[in-house]
């Protein structure tokens, strides 16, 4: 089954779950591990290999948005043992006791992690000791080279002006521009473009970014965190805000569909966010020992390699990186060089009032009011 079909299937399963289904659950006496992860984050056959090698059964669920995780975990008794979660959002849940610290003594494969990469990724103090890193990347934009150059032959593509300058974006409206439907991904990039603090939540900064986004709103086809994964490979968009690995995924899906397309990925010179997904164990996990066995399995170099190669997201596993193709290791969209990394920033968690203020900005922009 292709990745495209899996995404559609995962979305359908989530919809069914929202209609009354329960997540994977089980008593602590069962020899299972209940896992909740992003769609397309584990390579085919990996789960089956874990079950075969350990004798531990895996109940594996996927999700499309981080908000889904928050609802399940804050409600309590989710039944999950292992959850892959964005470190920024996970830090909020740690504050209210949702996650427990991992036992590093049970994770000998931590030795495979690259100390230098780990130093660069160590941007959230609040999650230290609570996870093992899984994948990481940047937030930028993917663009169709041919479609953009037809309309803007001389436009520099190292700037977020391609997204936020009305004069430029208006010339791309006919071929399609999409924005993230996420305050944690959209607003920091927009604030950085205005030369403001990307984590600003003060009234003046939010008013400025809202005004700018409303100016380009007529030229934005839609706001979504995943629809562009279907539309970009089919040439139904020419520019899409995206996470770094999705650029490579879009190319792969185009190849699978036999579509000839030239895509590129840019990290804006004004700045872009860095994100990190960690693997967490909920405080009320029913199978904590099995959870550690699963975490250690994911840290194995051969398994980390397969998952990184399949998902097209960067891995912090040094042993696994050595197994990747030279083209992948040298792909600046997946593994940015030091110059590109100097332009990325961390996004900070905010309190409920600040989050509501940011959410109101996005809601007004989406409605065009």
Regions found by a protein language model. Give the residues of each.
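Ligand-binding pocket segment of bilobal, Venus flytrap-like solute-binding proteins
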Residues: 178-190, 194-266
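Hinge/lid segment of periplasmic solute-binding proteins
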Residues: 69-71, 91-136, 155-156, 161-164
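Early extracytoplasmic/lumenal segment of secretory-pathway proteins
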Residues: 21-93, 230
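Ligand-binding "clamshell"
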Residues: 94-102, 119-120, 126-128, 219, ...
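Conserved C-terminal helix/tail region of periplasmic/extracytoplasmic solute-binding proteins
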Residues: 338-369
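C-terminal motif of bacterial Sec signal peptides marking the signal peptidase cleavage site
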Residues: 15-18
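Mature extracytoplasmic/periplasmic domains
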Residues: 277, 282-346
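Short beta-strand->loop
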Residues: 100-111, 257-273, 282-284
């Amino acid at each position: 089954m292709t990745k495209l079909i899996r995404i559609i299937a995962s979305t359908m399963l989530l919809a069914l779950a929202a209609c009354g289904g329960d997540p994977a659950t089980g008593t602590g006496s069962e020899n299972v591990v209940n896992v909740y992860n992003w769609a397309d984050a584990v390579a085919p056959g990996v789960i089956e290999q874990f079950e075969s090698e350990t004798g531990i059964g895996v109940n594996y669920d996927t999700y499309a948005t981080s908000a889904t995780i928050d609802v399940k975990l804050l409600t309590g008794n989710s039944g999950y043992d292992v959850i892959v979660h964005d470190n920024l959002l996970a830090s909020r849940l740690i504050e209210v006791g949702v996650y427990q610290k991992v036992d590093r003594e049970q994770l000998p494969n931590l030795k495979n992690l690259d100390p230098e990469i780990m130093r660069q990724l160590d941007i959230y103090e609040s999650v230290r000791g609570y996870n093992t890193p899984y994948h990481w990347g940047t937030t930028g934009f993917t663009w169709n080279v041919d479609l953009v150059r037809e309309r803007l032959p001389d436009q520099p593509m190292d700037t977020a002006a391609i997204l936020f300058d009305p004069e430029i974006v208006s010339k791309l409206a006919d071929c399609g521009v999409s924005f993230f439907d996420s305050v944690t991904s959209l607003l920091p990039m927009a604030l950085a473009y205005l030369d403001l603090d990307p984590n600003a939540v003060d009234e003046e900064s939010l008013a400025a970014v809202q005004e700018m986004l409303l100016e380009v709103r007529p030229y934005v086809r839609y706001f979504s965190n995943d629809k562009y994964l279907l539309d970009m490979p089919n040439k139904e968009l020419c520019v899409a805000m995206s996470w770094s690995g999705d650029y490579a995924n879009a190319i792969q899906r185009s190849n699978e569909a036999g579509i000839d397309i030239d895509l590129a990925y840019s990290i804006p010179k004004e700045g872009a966010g860095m994100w990190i997904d960690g693997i967490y164990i909920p405080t009320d996990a029913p199978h904590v020992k099995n959870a550690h066995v699963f975490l250690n399995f994911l840290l194995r170099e051969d398994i980390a390699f397969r998952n990184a190669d399949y998902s097209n997201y960067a891995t912090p596993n040094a042993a696994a990186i050595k197994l990747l193709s030279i083209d992948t290791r040298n792909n600046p969209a997946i593994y940015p060089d030091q110059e590109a990394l100097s332009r990325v920033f961390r996004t900070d968690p905010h309190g409920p009032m600040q989050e509501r203020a940011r959410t109101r900005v996005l809601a007004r922009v989406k409605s065009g009011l």
